[in-house]
């Protein structure tokens, strides 16, 4: 490689704020310096890395408007030039949600969507998408923005969901040396009482132990708190000793960064 020319146009080319430092970082990260052997695969990867680094934050519509690798067989050299147009600065706008049937849009709003006016970030969109995808409510989730929006300062956040089947019935069977046989039917309802409450319930019947349980998990509150309530009843008959146990409890989980604080209140009654 005999020479490299890396030009930028659009908002990023303005000599204001943090733009010069970001431009310098992009030039520093360029992966094909002068003197390095030229390979087409490396050239393609280097231009894509520049575009990805730029479009990942603020400049969602960034595009390569010109790229050229002039090969001189006589001198066995390559002169490289790339022009990248950052486009305008993008900020998140209102949610545009499609695909909801059973659930209300307020359910999606509980999973911390980007705030209108917040600078665009691909990582922020992925965090929001993963939060929705990891629930029991949706079979698939796609979150993106309108990169051709006429209002990049308030680009709509498009949320496309496919709802999962809310109700599921399961059945398990097993045999082991200690409790003997085991039969366990279960029932789950992610739209319990038509309120997006997630019911997880089951009946476990073993040769020496019987258990019935039900837990209800509420969707997160607007501040991220997770609440749940559960009940359980158990009967055992081991070596002629019969026991009865009933339990009811409530749990609140409060996220704080990477730490979860869990507060629980439980009442339990046991009898022989």
Predicted regions and their residues:
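Interaction-mediating elements
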Residues: 1-157, 164-166, 180-182
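Gram-negative/organellar outer-membrane beta-barrel architecture
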Residues: 13-25, 118-272
